[in-house]
């Protein structure tokens, strides 16, 4: 597989800004569904790695939740732009591990970027409300706040767009994320993380 940006093909998990293996050293084979050829191996993560990812994401949440809606919007827009810039490579990775024709894979990459663009705009529209109170002289004020760490489990058949659809929504409102991609298609998820790690402040808030 020839990529313009070889740094997008990762064979380790992404936790707290670092590429790490499993504590046990165990790995899972990833196969090309067309040829059954082994593409590579990724860490077989256990409870300990999962707990570390969630704990680190919760630590990052304390800072991320304080960012303004505008700041989050700008970062998400840049993330979407970077995915579009790397669309050809991301499509190649998807095709070799998932089996979609290259044109269809690229279509999914662009669809995934459109989800990020959508939520980048929605980040600025998380409004509260004022509700009439049944008691005289009083009003009910509603505010919306980020809830914490969001776990995103994503399928093999849309290995890119379901990540961006879930994570962009969570990040837009100030939550941090931990992603569990399908074991058949981990490289698309890791490539999305690699894009954010290389160019954005997302390494502290997005884990795979």
Protein language model features and the residues they cover:
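Terminal low-complexity tails and localization/encapsulation signals of metabolic enzymes
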Residues: 1-41, 74, 78, 128-153
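Single conserved hydrophobic/aromatic residue that forms the stacking wall/gate
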Residues: 199-208
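Glycine-rich loop-to-alpha-helix module at the N-terminal edge of alpha/beta enzyme cores
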Residues: 37-126, 137
């Amino acid at each position: 597989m020839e990529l313009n940006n070889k740094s997008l093909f990762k064979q380790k998990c992404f936790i707290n800004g670092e590429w790490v293996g499993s504590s046990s050293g165990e790995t899972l084979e990833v196969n090309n569904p067309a040829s059954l050829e082994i593409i590579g191996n990724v860490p077989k993560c256990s409870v300990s790695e999962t707990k570390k990812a969630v704990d680190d994401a919760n630590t990052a949440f304390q800072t991320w939740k304080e960012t303004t809606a505008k700041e989050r919007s700008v970062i998400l827009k840049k993330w979407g732009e970077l995915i579009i810039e790397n669309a050809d490579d991301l499509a190649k990775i998807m095709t070799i591990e998932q089996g979609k024709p290259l044109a269809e894979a690229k279509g999914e990459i662009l669809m995934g970027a459109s989800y990020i663009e959508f939520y980048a705009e929605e980040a600025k529209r998380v409004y509260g409300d004022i509700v009439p109170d049944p008691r005289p002289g009083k009003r009910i004020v509603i505010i919306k706040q980020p809830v914490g760490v969001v776990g995103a489990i994503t399928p093999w058949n849309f290995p890119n767009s379901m990540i961006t659809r879930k994570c962009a929504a969570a990040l837009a409102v100030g939550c941090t994320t931990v992603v569990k991609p399908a074991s058949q298609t981990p490289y698309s998820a890791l490539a999305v993380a690699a894009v954010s790690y290389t160019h954005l402040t997302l390494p502290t808030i997005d884990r795979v």
